[in-house]
Curated annotation (Swiss-Prot):
Residues 411-436 are annotated as: Disordered. InterPro entries: G-protein_beta_WD-40_rep, Quinoprotein_ADH-like_sf, Sof1, WD40/YVTN_repeat-like_dom_sf, WD40_rpt, WD_repeat_DCAF13/WDSOF1. It comes from Schizosaccharomyces pombe (strain 972 / ATCC 24843). Residues 423-436 have a biased composition (Basic and acidic residues). Interacts with snoRNA U3. Component of the ribosomal small subunit (SSU) processome composed of at least 40 protein subunits and snoRNA U3. This is Protein sof1. Keywords: Cytoplasm, Cytoskeleton, Nucleus, Repeat, WD repeat. SMART domains: WD40. Required for ribosomal RNA processing. One of its GO terms (cellular component) is nucleus. It is found in: Nucleus, Nucleolus; Cytoplasm, Cytoskeleton, Spindle.
Length: 436
């Protein structure tokens, strides 16, 4: 009699290998596939909220005064600098959450911080000085004297240039003691200046006169001036889409603009209940983070008008500065309670090493959550957040005010001649005018 046996080669398997599972993917054999996937998506959403723990801790023992500026080193993942109201600049090691050095360089509030292309720290303050601090020990390598109080600073990624803003926008060369070029358009103060990451000769500034001005170093002249309804407090360029930038406004919203067409905003981002003080793009260009006067930090997807997450703590006060880390996994925040805090960009993510099976499982659950995110139950769980009482109450009052204004406008339109009260588009409402 002939007996058939199953044999396996010992060289093809290992002791801890998982037995392969044979699956037939024919849909007719899986009539309950959709129900199973919905259950998995629901459980994955619940587990995601259950493991959400965004706050990692504060860096060191903080400052002696409020933190008003932050900078990240674009060549490393762990270096972050902060400037405070007492004129001190500190360099932090994010991996150890400790302080490397402190430099008491300035006599006034450190308004602007940035890392130079060589890795040194550039700081500016209301005492009119710009100091280049050695990254290794914090000692002053070089100083520059401006014409007036300096409110912001940024470096060009394409050369040895940096820009400062105050009464005007000044372009400096590292090797010169005086500005190479000065830009002026109007007579008001300019608290914000930012270089484009990709088009390195283009920069933007925001003024106290509610203006946003685009400059081009190749023509040594301003290009366009946008006038908005309320003042812009912060600007950040998209590192992946060279023409787009987001602006944080005093009207609690953020606006995405295309520098080629400033007649309307590309997107309007809502949810804050007080002025937006700082905004910064993720290195991926898909998300950005904002810090507000309402003591919260919000993370936005560039294609969604509402925040995907909101961070807050009981002790954190008004957020004055936020920055993404260069790997887009962490967020630095500075507030006027003198602390620099470290957050996860994904509240439920962990930095531990994952096996291939675990990585594939997480990707599968992410795809299920994305597929079923519009189901009411899953959407409710994914969107639910606990907010401070004052923020929740302010949001309710703001919602009632907006609905009241809408009803009033609709009543006026209903009792007026047809076409006398035109509809005002949301993306054009914030724009007052454009000058060239």
């Amino acid at each position: 009699m002939k007996v058939k046996t199953i044999t396996r080669g010992t060289s093809l398997t290992r002791l801890n290998d998982q037995d392969p599972v044979k699956r037939n993917l024919d849909p007719s054999l899986h009539p309950f596939e959709r129900a199973r996937e919905y259950t998995r998506a629901l459980n994955a959403t619940k587990m995601d909220r259950m493991f959400a723990a965004p706050f990692l801790g504060q860096l060191g023992r903080g400052h002696q005064d409020g933190v008003y500026s932050l900078a990240r080193d674009t060549k490393t993942l762990i270096d972050c600098a902060s400037g405070s109201g007492d004129g001190a600049v500190k360099l932090w090691d994010a991996s150890e959450r400790c302080e490397r050095w402190t430099s008491k360089a300035h006599e006034g509030i450190v308004r602007g911080l940035v890392f130079s292309n060589q890795g040194d720290v550039l700081s500016c303050a209301s005492d009119r000085y710009v100091y280049m601090l050695n990254k290794q020990d914090g000692k002053v390598k070089r100083s520059y004297l401006g014409d007036s109080s300096l409110l912001d600073i940024d470096t060009s990624k394409g050369g040895d240039l940096f820009a400062t803003s105050g009464e005007n926008v000044s372009i400096w060369d590292y090797s010169r003691d005086t500005p190479v070029t000065k830009f002026e358009w109007g007579a008001d103060t300019l608290p914000v200046v930012k270089f484009n990451y990709t088009e390195t000769s283009v920069l933007a500034s925001a003024g106290m006169d509610r203006s946003i001005v685009i400059y081009d170093l190749r023509t040594s002249s301003p290009l366009t001036k946008l006038i908005t309804k309320l003042r812009t407090n912060s600007i950040s360029w998209n590192p992946m889409e060279a023409f787009n930038f987001v602006a944080g406004s005093e009207d609690h919203n953020l606006y995405m603009y295309d520098m080629r067409n400033l007649k309307r905003a590309l997107h309007v981002y809502k949810d804050h209940v007080s002025a937006v003080m700082s905004v910064d793009f993720s290195p991926t260009g898909q998300e950005f983070v904002s810090g507000s006067y309402d003591k919260t930090i919000r993370i936005y997807n560039v294609r969604e008008g509402h925040s995907r997450d909101v961070y807050h703590t009981k002790r954190m006060q008004r957020v004055t500065a936020v920055k993404f880390s260069m790997d887009a996994q962490y967020i630095f925040s500075g507030s006027d309670d003198s602390n620099v805090r470290l957050w996860r960009a994904r509240a439920s993510s962990r930095a531990s090493i994952r096996s291939t099976r675990e990585e594939n499982r997480l990707k599968y659950l992410d795809s299920l959550r994305e597929r079923y995110k519009h189901i009411p139950e899953i959407r409710r769980i994914a969107r639910h957040r606990h907010l401070p009482t004052n923020v929740k109450k302010a949001a309710e009052i703001k919602r009632e005010e907006i609905n009241s204004l809408k009803r009033r406008e609709e009543n006026i339109r209903r009792h007026s001649k047809k076409g006398a009260v035109p509809y005002e588009k949301e993306r054009e409402r914030h724009v007052v005018g454009i000058q060239k």
